[in-house]
UniProtKB/Swiss-Prot annotation:
GO biological process, one term: mitochondrial respiratory chain complex III assembly
Function: Component of the ubiquinol-cytochrome c oxidoreductase, a multisubunit transmembrane complex that is part of the mitochondrial electron transport chain which drives oxidative phosphorylation.
Protein known as: Cytochrome b-c1 complex subunit 7
Entry membrane topology: Peripheral membrane protein
Source species taxonomy: Eukaryota, Fungi, Dikarya, Ascomycota, Saccharomycotina
Pfam families from the UniProt entry: UCR_14kD (PF02271)
Localization: Mitochondrion inner membrane
Record bears the keyword Amino-acid biosynthesis: no
Keywords, alphabetical: Electron transport, Membrane, Mitochondrion, Mitochondrion inner membrane, Respiratory chain, Transport
Subunit structure comment from the entry: Component of the ubiquinol-cytochrome c oxidoreductase (cytochrome b-c1 complex, complex III, CIII), a multisubunit enzyme composed of 3 respiratory subunits cytochrome b, cytochrome c1 and Rieske protein, 2 core protein subunits, and additional low-molecular weight protein subunits. The complex exists as an obligatory dimer and forms supercomplexes (SCs) in the inner mitochondrial membrane with cytochrome c oxidase (complex IV, CIV).
GO cellular component, one term: respiratory chain complex III
Keyword Transport: yes
InterPro entries, A to Z: QCR7 (IPR003197), QCR7_sf (IPR036544)
Amino acid sequence: MASITSVVKTSELILKSPLLSKIVVPLAKTYVKFSGYRQLGFKMNDLIIEETPNMQLALRRLPPTESYDRVYRLIRATQFSLSHKLATGNDITKPEEDDHYLIPYILDVEAEAFEKDALDNLEVVKRK
């Protein structure tokens, strides 16, 4: 599985290139439209797998209001799924509301993990 850091770097590369941007951005918007997570009230970052240690740490760093909103969206989507219905009206996540609220925290955690790994594997070389 790719790290969020590599995904962000790839997306920045795609957005910098006019040709790639013209091809990939409409495809991504179409994919998001047909994926259906917004019809359940989710934001895109709600779909990231939670079971990794980095994700657990990033979730703990969320502000309380954002954390409560995330749990509310998960509970509401579960209710929609159990009742075999989709959200209507105000419950649907609009594209302008679908922000990447969790990505900065994940990037910080991954950078810290990378730095920790680099320091843990540091080799001290004795000078002559």
